[in-house]
Amino acid sequence: MNSNDLLRALSVPQGPVDVVLDTDTYNEIDDQFALSYLMRSPELHTKAIYAAPFFNENSSGPEDGMLKSYDEIFKVLKLLGERAEVYKGSPAYLPDEHTPVVSPAAEDLCRRAKEYRPERPLYVVAIGAITNIASAILMDPSITDRIVVAWLGGHGLDFHDTKEFNLIQDVAAARVVMGSGAPFVQLPCYGVVSAFSTSRPELEYWLKGKNPLADYLCRNTIEAAESYAAGTAWSRIIWDVTAVAWLLNRDDRFM
Protein backbone atom coordinates (compact mmCIF):
# COMPACT_ATOMS: atom_id res chain seq x y z
CA MET A 1 0.00 0.00 0.00
CA ASN A 2 1.47 3.36 -1.03
CA SER A 3 1.32 6.49 1.13
CA ASN A 4 -1.65 7.94 -0.75
CA ASP A 5 -3.68 4.78 -0.25
CA LEU A 6 -2.71 4.70 3.42
CA LEU A 7 -3.76 8.31 4.02
CA ARG A 8 -7.04 7.70 2.23
CA ALA A 9 -7.64 4.54 4.27
CA LEU A 10 -7.09 6.40 7.54
CA SER A 11 -9.64 9.05 6.60
CA VAL A 12 -13.36 8.72 7.26
CA PRO A 13 -14.93 7.10 4.19
CA GLN A 14 -16.91 9.47 2.00
CA GLY A 15 -19.52 7.09 0.66
CA PRO A 16 -21.10 3.67 1.16
CA VAL A 17 -18.61 1.01 2.29
CA ASP A 18 -18.56 -2.71 2.96
CA VAL A 19 -18.09 -3.70 6.60
CA VAL A 20 -17.52 -6.79 8.71
CA LEU A 21 -18.12 -6.59 12.46
CA ASP A 22 -16.06 -8.52 15.02
CA THR A 23 -17.97 -8.49 18.31
CA ASP A 24 -18.01 -10.07 21.78
CA THR A 25 -21.74 -9.42 21.81
CA TYR A 26 -22.59 -11.15 25.10
CA ASN A 27 -19.79 -9.45 27.03
CA GLU A 28 -22.02 -6.57 28.18
CA ILE A 29 -24.71 -4.23 26.86
CA ASP A 30 -22.98 -2.00 24.31
CA ASP A 31 -22.22 -4.45 21.48
CA GLN A 32 -25.95 -4.84 20.89
CA PHE A 33 -26.23 -1.10 20.30
CA ALA A 34 -23.28 -1.18 17.88
CA LEU A 35 -24.64 -4.14 15.93
CA SER A 36 -28.07 -2.51 15.67
CA TYR A 37 -26.56 0.80 14.57
CA LEU A 38 -24.50 -0.92 11.90
CA MET A 39 -27.41 -2.92 10.52
CA ARG A 40 -29.66 0.13 10.42
CA SER A 41 -27.13 2.42 8.66
CA PRO A 42 -27.84 2.40 4.90
CA GLU A 43 -24.34 3.71 4.11
CA LEU A 44 -22.74 0.67 5.74
CA HIS A 45 -23.14 -2.65 3.95
CA THR A 46 -22.72 -5.45 6.50
CA LYS A 47 -21.01 -8.37 4.78
CA ALA A 48 -20.36 -10.61 7.79
CA ILE A 49 -20.43 -10.69 11.58
CA TYR A 50 -17.79 -12.53 13.62
CA ALA A 51 -18.24 -13.72 17.20
CA ALA A 52 -15.21 -12.79 19.32
CA PRO A 53 -13.95 -14.55 22.46
CA PHE A 54 -14.18 -12.96 25.89
CA PHE A 55 -13.77 -14.03 29.51
CA ASN A 56 -15.42 -12.24 32.41
CA GLU A 57 -18.27 -12.85 34.85
CA ASN A 58 -20.59 -13.49 31.89
CA SER A 59 -18.65 -16.49 30.59
CA SER A 60 -16.73 -19.50 31.86
CA GLY A 61 -13.85 -18.91 29.44
CA PRO A 62 -12.98 -17.41 26.03
CA GLU A 63 -14.69 -20.16 24.03
CA ASP A 64 -17.87 -19.95 26.11
CA GLY A 65 -17.83 -16.18 25.66
CA MET A 66 -17.48 -16.57 21.89
CA LEU A 67 -20.33 -19.09 21.70
CA LYS A 68 -22.61 -16.92 23.84
CA SER A 69 -21.75 -13.97 21.61
CA TYR A 70 -22.59 -16.05 18.54
CA ASP A 71 -26.04 -16.77 19.97
CA GLU A 72 -26.53 -13.15 21.03
CA ILE A 73 -25.80 -11.94 17.50
CA PHE A 74 -28.71 -14.01 16.19
CA LYS A 75 -30.94 -12.74 19.00
CA VAL A 76 -30.27 -9.13 18.02
CA LEU A 77 -30.69 -9.90 14.31
CA LYS A 78 -34.07 -11.48 15.03
CA LEU A 79 -35.17 -8.38 16.95
CA LEU A 80 -33.98 -6.28 14.02
CA GLY A 81 -35.80 -8.47 11.51
CA GLU A 82 -32.52 -8.80 9.61
CA ARG A 83 -30.32 -11.59 8.29
CA ALA A 84 -26.55 -11.66 7.96
CA GLU A 85 -23.68 -14.08 7.52
CA VAL A 86 -22.48 -14.93 11.04
CA TYR A 87 -19.32 -16.89 11.84
CA LYS A 88 -17.95 -18.43 15.01
CA GLY A 89 -14.61 -16.98 16.04
CA SER A 90 -11.57 -18.09 17.98
CA PRO A 91 -12.16 -20.45 20.92
CA ALA A 92 -8.95 -19.18 22.56
CA TYR A 93 -6.61 -16.20 22.52
CA LEU A 94 -3.39 -16.23 20.51
CA PRO A 95 -0.71 -18.38 22.16
CA ASP A 96 1.97 -16.01 20.82
CA GLU A 97 2.51 -13.40 18.11
CA HIS A 98 3.24 -15.96 15.39
CA THR A 99 0.54 -18.63 15.73
CA PRO A 100 -3.02 -18.00 14.52
CA VAL A 101 -6.11 -19.53 16.10
CA VAL A 102 -7.90 -20.85 13.03
CA SER A 103 -11.67 -20.33 13.09
CA PRO A 104 -14.55 -19.90 10.63
CA ALA A 105 -14.39 -16.14 11.25
CA ALA A 106 -10.67 -15.87 10.49
CA GLU A 107 -11.04 -18.07 7.43
CA ASP A 108 -13.92 -15.95 6.14
CA LEU A 109 -11.95 -12.72 6.57
CA CYS A 110 -8.98 -14.19 4.68
CA ARG A 111 -11.26 -15.24 1.84
CA ARG A 112 -13.48 -12.16 1.82
CA ALA A 113 -10.67 -9.60 1.94
CA LYS A 114 -9.32 -10.93 -1.36
CA GLU A 115 -12.34 -9.34 -3.08
CA TYR A 116 -11.12 -5.84 -2.15
CA ARG A 117 -8.19 -3.60 -3.05
CA PRO A 118 -6.35 -0.65 -1.45
CA GLU A 119 -8.46 1.98 -3.20
CA ARG A 120 -11.66 0.16 -2.18
CA PRO A 121 -10.93 -1.66 1.10
CA LEU A 122 -13.07 -3.80 3.35
CA TYR A 123 -13.68 -2.08 6.69
CA VAL A 124 -13.20 -4.31 9.72
CA VAL A 125 -14.92 -2.92 12.82
CA ALA A 126 -13.58 -4.76 15.87
CA ILE A 127 -15.16 -4.17 19.27
CA GLY A 128 -13.70 -6.96 21.38
CA ALA A 129 -10.45 -8.84 21.82
CA ILE A 130 -8.94 -8.68 18.34
CA THR A 131 -8.01 -12.37 18.12
CA ASN A 132 -10.02 -13.17 14.99
CA ILE A 133 -8.50 -10.32 13.01
CA ALA A 134 -4.95 -11.06 14.14
CA SER A 135 -5.41 -14.73 13.26
CA ALA A 136 -6.57 -13.85 9.75
CA ILE A 137 -3.55 -11.59 9.25
CA LEU A 138 -1.19 -14.33 10.45
CA MET A 139 -2.90 -16.82 8.14
CA ASP A 140 -2.62 -14.51 5.12
CA PRO A 141 -0.55 -11.32 5.59
CA SER A 142 -1.49 -10.13 2.09
CA ILE A 143 -4.92 -9.03 3.32
CA THR A 144 -3.39 -6.06 5.16
CA ASP A 145 -3.44 -4.07 1.90
CA ARG A 146 -7.13 -4.80 1.43
CA ILE A 147 -8.64 -3.95 4.83
CA VAL A 148 -8.99 -1.03 7.21
CA VAL A 149 -9.27 -1.94 10.89
CA ALA A 150 -11.23 0.28 13.29
CA TRP A 151 -10.75 -1.08 16.82
CA LEU A 152 -12.36 -0.11 20.10
CA GLY A 153 -9.50 -0.97 22.43
CA GLY A 154 -6.76 0.35 24.67
CA HIS A 155 -6.90 3.65 26.54
CA GLY A 156 -5.98 7.22 25.65
CA LEU A 157 -2.24 7.75 25.27
CA ASP A 158 -2.16 10.01 28.33
CA PHE A 159 -4.03 7.54 30.54
CA HIS A 160 -2.06 6.07 33.44
CA ASP A 161 -2.29 2.42 32.32
CA THR A 162 -3.21 0.19 29.38
CA LYS A 163 -5.27 -2.35 31.33
CA GLU A 164 -8.25 -2.11 29.01
CA PHE A 165 -10.51 -5.17 28.65
CA ASN A 166 -10.29 -5.70 24.88
CA LEU A 167 -6.53 -5.15 24.86
CA ILE A 168 -5.47 -7.03 27.98
CA GLN A 169 -7.37 -10.20 27.03
CA ASP A 170 -5.13 -10.79 24.01
CA VAL A 171 -2.06 -8.56 24.00
CA ALA A 172 -0.40 -10.73 21.36
CA ALA A 173 -3.31 -10.16 18.97
CA ALA A 174 -3.18 -6.40 19.48
CA ARG A 175 0.55 -6.42 18.74
CA VAL A 176 0.03 -8.45 15.57
CA VAL A 177 -2.64 -6.11 14.20
CA MET A 178 -0.87 -2.90 15.20
CA GLY A 179 2.40 -4.11 13.70
CA SER A 180 0.95 -5.63 10.55
CA GLY A 181 0.94 -2.52 8.39
CA ALA A 182 -2.83 -2.65 7.90
CA PRO A 183 -4.46 0.80 8.14
CA PHE A 184 -5.47 0.98 11.79
CA VAL A 185 -7.85 3.40 13.51
CA GLN A 186 -7.93 3.16 17.30
CA LEU A 187 -10.92 4.23 19.39
CA PRO A 188 -9.30 4.47 22.86
CA CYS A 189 -11.52 3.76 25.85
CA TYR A 190 -10.73 5.76 29.01
CA GLY A 191 -9.71 9.27 28.12
CA VAL A 192 -11.60 9.32 24.81
CA VAL A 193 -14.63 7.08 24.29
CA SER A 194 -15.45 7.20 28.00
CA ALA A 195 -17.18 10.53 27.29
CA PHE A 196 -19.85 8.71 25.26
CA SER A 197 -22.53 7.71 27.74
CA THR A 198 -26.27 7.51 28.23
CA SER A 199 -28.61 7.60 31.23
CA ARG A 200 -31.87 6.05 32.35
CA PRO A 201 -34.00 9.11 31.45
CA GLU A 202 -32.46 9.19 27.96
CA LEU A 203 -32.99 5.47 27.42
CA GLU A 204 -36.59 5.59 28.58
CA TYR A 205 -37.38 8.70 26.52
CA TRP A 206 -35.77 7.60 23.26
CA LEU A 207 -36.13 3.80 23.33
CA LYS A 208 -38.74 2.48 25.75
CA GLY A 209 -41.91 1.34 24.02
CA LYS A 210 -40.68 2.08 20.49
CA ASN A 211 -40.22 -1.52 19.29
CA PRO A 212 -39.01 -4.90 20.64
CA LEU A 213 -35.36 -4.14 19.86
CA ALA A 214 -35.50 -0.74 21.54
CA ASP A 215 -37.14 -2.30 24.59
CA TYR A 216 -34.41 -4.96 24.72
CA LEU A 217 -31.59 -2.41 24.54
CA CYS A 218 -33.27 -0.20 27.13
CA ARG A 219 -33.97 -3.04 29.55
CA ASN A 220 -30.49 -4.56 29.22
CA THR A 221 -28.75 -1.28 29.92
CA ILE A 222 -30.94 -0.30 32.85
CA GLU A 223 -30.65 -3.73 34.48
CA ALA A 224 -26.86 -3.70 34.10
CA ALA A 225 -26.49 -0.22 35.56
CA GLU A 226 -28.98 -0.82 38.37
CA SER A 227 -27.00 -3.90 39.43
CA TYR A 228 -24.29 -1.61 40.85
CA ALA A 229 -25.82 1.88 40.93
CA ALA A 230 -29.43 1.44 42.03
CA GLY A 231 -30.80 4.50 43.77
CA THR A 232 -28.27 6.86 42.20
CA ALA A 233 -28.35 9.14 39.16
CA TRP A 234 -26.16 6.92 37.01
CA SER A 235 -24.84 7.11 33.46
CA ARG A 236 -23.52 4.21 31.41
CA ILE A 237 -20.80 4.32 28.76
CA ILE A 238 -21.82 2.60 25.52
CA TRP A 239 -18.31 2.18 24.20
CA ASP A 240 -18.72 0.08 21.08
CA VAL A 241 -21.08 2.39 19.22
CA THR A 242 -18.20 4.78 18.53
CA ALA A 243 -16.33 2.32 16.31
CA VAL A 244 -19.32 2.15 13.98
CA ALA A 245 -19.89 5.90 14.28
CA TRP A 246 -16.34 6.61 13.07
CA LEU A 247 -17.29 5.22 9.66
CA LEU A 248 -20.16 7.73 9.49
CA ASN A 249 -18.18 10.73 10.76
CA ARG A 250 -18.03 12.69 7.51
CA ASP A 251 -17.39 16.40 8.06
CA ASP A 252 -16.69 15.67 11.76
CA ARG A 253 -20.39 15.49 12.48
CA PHE A 254 -19.94 13.20 15.49
CA MET A 255 -16.35 13.54 16.73
Explain the meaning of each model-derived region:
Residues 1-255:
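N-terminal acidic, glycine/proline-rich low-complexity segments
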